[in-house]
Amino acid sequence: MARTKQTARKSTGGKAPRKQLASKAARKAAPSTGGVKKPHRYKPGAVALREIRRYQKSTELLIRKLPFQRLVREIAQDFKSDLRFQSSAIGALQESVEAYLVSLFEDTNLCAIHAKRVTIQSKDIQLARRLRGERS
């Protein structure tokens, strides 16, 4: 076979493989310890943000119906015994209570942000109620 002259070609910019450090090579060569896999963990705050988005989208009631009904009956007993409630009345009470709590927590969060915090505290709730005129 006749020898042919080789022509010069432009390089494609590929890099030559580099030598691995001894510690990396040792880590790759060593077998994994017992095959125990760590459970997957989300970054701090990621799950909380997902829950916030989920509950902001939803419209269902968040307080369970029967415990709320027992609480209403217990409070009503202090005013008059043997009171009866329509189920629609309990439902209306629960809707209004949850709407009140959501708006209170929104105002409480604003108070915490104003204090340059991200965690709400009892003093934030007290301030929000005081600004609303609910408590002197």
UniProtKB/Swiss-Prot annotation:
The keyword Phosphoprotein applies. One of its GO terms (molecular function) is protein heterodimerization activity. SMART domains: H3. Keywords: Acetylation, Chromosome, DNA-binding, Methylation, Nucleosome core, Nucleus, Phosphoprotein. Residues 1-42 are annotated as: Disordered. InterPro entries: Histone-fold (IPR009072), Histone_H2A/H2B/H3 (IPR007125), Histone_H3/CENP-A (IPR000164). The modification Phosphoserine is found at residue 11. It is found in: Nucleus; Chromosome. PROSITE patterns: HISTONE_H3_1, HISTONE_H3_2. Phosphorylated to form H3S10ph. H3S10ph promotes subsequent H3K14ac formation and is required for transcriptional activation through TBP recruitment to the promoters. Mono-, di- and trimethylated by the COMPASS complex to form H3K4me1/2/3. H3K4me activates gene expression by regulating transcription elongation and plays a role in telomere length maintenance. H3K4me enrichment correlates with transcription levels, and occurs in a 5' to 3' gradient with H3K4me3 enrichment at the 5'-end of genes, shifting to H3K4me2 and then H3K4me1. Methylated by SET2 to form H3K36me. H3K36me represses gene expression. Methylated by DOT1 to form H3K79me. H3K79me is required for association of SIR proteins with telomeric regions and for telomeric silencing. The modification N6,N6-dimethyllysine is found at residues 5, 15, 28, 37, 80. CDD domains: HFD_H3. The modification N6-methyllysine is found at residues 5, 10, 15, 19, 24, 28, 37, 80. The modification N6,N6,N6-trimethyllysine is found at residues 5, 28, 37, 80. It comes from the Eukaryota. One of its GO terms (cellular component) is nucleosome. The modification N6-acetyllysine is found at residues 10, 15, 19, 24, 28, 37, 57, 65. The nucleosome is a histone octamer containing two molecules each of H2A, H2B, H3 and H4 assembled in one H3-H4 heterotetramer and two H2A-H2B heterodimers. The octamer wraps approximately 147 bp of DNA. Belongs to the histone H3 family. Core component of nucleosome. Nucleosomes wrap and compact DNA into chromatin, limiting DNA accessibility to the cellular machineries which require DNA as a template. Histones thereby play a central role in transcription regulation, DNA repair, DNA replication and chromosomal stability. DNA accessibility is regulated via a complex set of post-translational modifications of histones, also called histone code, and nucleosome remodeling. This is Histone H3. The gene is HHT1.
